[in-house]
Amino acid sequence: MGKIENNERVILNVGGTRHETYRSTLKTLPGTRLALLASSEPQGDCLTAAGDKLQPLPPPLSPPPRPPPLSPVPSGCFEGGAGNCSSHGGNGSDHPGGGREFFFDRHPGVFAYVLNYYRTGKLHCPADVCGPLFEEELAFWGIDETDVEPCCWMTYRQHRDAEEALDIFETPDLIGGDPGDDEDLGGKRLGIEDAAGLGGPDGKSGRWRKLQPRMWALFEDPYSSRAARFIAFASLFFILVSITTFCLETHEAFNIVKNKTEPVINGTSAVLQYEIETDPALTYVEGVCVVWFTFEFLVRIVFSPNKLEFIKNLLNIIDFVAILPFYLEVGLSGLSSKAAKDVLGFLRVVRFVRILRIFKLTRHFVGLRVLGHTLRASTNEFLLLIIFLALGVLIFATMIYYAERVGAQPNDPSASEHTQFKNIPIGFWWAVVTMTTLGYGDMYPQTWSGMLVGALCALAGVLTIAMPVPVIVNNFGMYYSLAMAKQKLPRKRKKHIPPAPLASSPTFCKTELNMACNSTQSDTCLGKENRLLEHNRSVLSGDDSTGSEPPLSPPERLPIRRSSTRDKNRRGETCFLLTTGDYTCASDGGIRKGYEKSRSLNNIAGLAGNALRLSPVTSPYNSPCPLRRSRSPIPSIL
């Protein structure tokens, strides 16, 4: 019995942390990575994430020496960033306890929650782990994210809201240094495609591609350079001057009254006509501001990477509408016809659009952008507040109308002598003023019943307004903290990653460290493996690498394999599958209590030919070179 129990035990070494459990525990979630691992033989074949079948690894010709205790555990197969997995002991088990040990190069802290899900049937999200990391680990272990318990779902979803908010507050990713880095990154950030060779013999296209992102950042991004900051301060100065001029034009000290009476020939009487004209000094100041706004608008539209998006922008529309009336007014001021005067009167009314230039400050102040995004994100809360107020206004306006009529005098049936609430629509105004705690005092109840209704209306208004306000404040705090964090992020520089050598290259297996490349097991040399590993890591991390060597052909992209005649005798069992095929639940692997609502289990349990659909964290990765296969005495199971 002890031997059978030891054979049923499995030791999972995840990132150096060992976890011990039973195979039956791992089989409680069929179709997941650990369930398929527990159901298959250790000597079974391995399937990659793309479904390619790997040849199993034969044991070495001679027993290799064990690594020292402080040396890292040799890695297993490395497929597209899926993680490393190794099985200790070959056919047998070299663990003193008798159980088999498998190594996964994954996050050990998250795996504790994953293993607890196999044991209890409840998947909880750790509060001290970043959301994308936990999401990636769930995808690796083959667990559906919808299995997360409701108590942890908000914690799990927080990272997605944060990522969406961070995408809103864009900051420049360029720094000084290599000029090529700025040009390439600036072109990508502005949406300008990198089209080498478009520049003609005279190089006009090349100069335009260099000038366009710089000029656009100069007028659009005040944090890109010192010159951009100077432009931003100048724009801010003219905005404030224009708004100040607009306000001073309404003051009587800057208004000049002129007599426009025209004598009529053979007329018996004359009608005096007066017009109010603005002080010419304010007109000149406004003209200087309009010239600056016109210059800024033309430069931005010329160097805009996307003209259509520029025209559709609300702030740009406000700029155009605020600039156009000034030129029309100057052009029509010399005309004396009645139609021209009517148009001038209309243009003077339209000039109030200039006050909307204050919204241009959102380009320069993060706090204003945060406020705008907060109002946009709190639309549901504002709608809820309006509904609550509308219900309260309707209820209390009706109550105050009938409450005031209760105390009416017998000789005043309409109650118009002792109260101002003559009808319910008039009570709407009183209810709004009372619920918002303004209390103008123009309308107030005069009977004891009306006073009671007024007190209830004031209390209900305080509670109604106070309920959605904390949600709006929390949204503002979240957006503001994320905006500040986005601004303090270190600026990125484009890194140069050397290309991986081709198999046909004379330097394919050479290393500067003079490492030995003589392998009796048809292994690749360590120098080549290190170089390929660096290249694979750079590609997986999202860095771009350029090279003059042609891409690999499809056969060359296949992982490096070991050839052995023993492969024919291996059983065709899998270690990990992304498609279940004709997989069915094991006869002895019943569903435990607590797993009935598991979507990971319901997607495949008892079904044949259905696919295990996992939401990938990243897009499928096609390696431009053979992936790393290290020399290890431990046979790979993944």
UniProtKB/Swiss-Prot annotation:
PANTHER family under this entry?
A: POTASSIUM VOLTAGE-GATED CHANNEL SUBFAMILY C MEMBER 2 (PTHR11537:SF172), VOLTAGE-GATED POTASSIUM CHANNEL (PTHR11537)
Classification via SUPFAM superfamilies: POZ domain, Voltage-gated potassium channels
Q: Which Pfam families match?
A: BTB_2 (PF02214), Ion_trans (PF00520)
Question: Membrane-spanning regions, if any?
Answer: 230-248, 284-303, 315-337, 346-368, 382-401, 451-473
What is this entry's stated membrane topology? Answer: Multi-pass membrane protein
Annotated catalysed reactions: K(+)(in) = K(+)(out)
Q: What does this protein do?
A: Voltage-gated potassium channel that mediates transmembrane potassium transport in excitable membranes, primarily in the brain. Contributes to the regulation of the fast action potential repolarization and in sustained high-frequency firing in neurons of the central nervous system. Homotetramer channels mediate delayed-rectifier voltage-dependent potassium currents that activate rapidly at high-threshold voltages and inactivate slowly. Forms tetrameric channels through which potassium ions pass in accordance with their electrochemical gradient.
The domain section of the record reads: The transmembrane segment S4 functions as a voltage-sensor and is characterized by a series of positively charged amino acids at every third position. Channel opening and closing is effected by a conformation change that affects the position and orientation of the voltage-sensor paddle formed by S3 and S4 within the membrane. A transmembrane electric field that is positive inside would push the positively charged S4 segment outwards, thereby opening the pore, while a field that is negative inside would pull the S4 segment inwards and close the pore.
- Which positions carry Phosphoserine? S564, S600
Per UniProt, activity regulation is:
Inhibited by Stichodactyla helianthus peptide ShK. Inhibited by millimolar levels of tetraethylammonium (TEA). Contrary to other channels, inhibited only by millimolar levels of 4-aminopyridine (4-AP).
Q: How does it assemble?
A: Homotetramer and heterotetramer with other channel-forming alpha subunits, such as KCNC1. Interacts with KCNC1. Homotetramer or heterotetramer channel activity is regulated by association with modulating ancillary subunits such as KCNE1, KCNE2 and KCNE3, creating a functionally diverse range of channel complexes. Interacts with KCNE1, KCNE2 and KCNE3.
Compositionally biased tracts (Pro residues): 56-72
- Residues on the membrane's Cytoplasmic side span 1-229, 304-314, 369-381, 474-638
* Native species: Rattus norvegicus
Gene this protein is translated from: Kcnc2
GO process terms (BP): action potential; cellular response to ammonium ion; cellular response to nitric oxide; cellular response to toxic substance; globus pallidus development; membrane hyperpolarization; monoatomic ion transmembrane transport; nitric oxide-cGMP-mediated signaling
The record ties this protein, via InterPro entries, to: BTB/POZ_dom, Ion_trans_dom, K_chnl_volt-dep_Kv, K_chnl_volt-dep_Kv3, SKP1/BTB/POZ_sf, T1-type_BTB, VG_K_chnl, Volt_channel_dom_sf
The places in or outside the cell where this protein is found are: Cell membrane; Membrane; Perikaryon; Cell projection, Axon
Name assigned to this protein: Voltage-gated potassium channel KCNC2
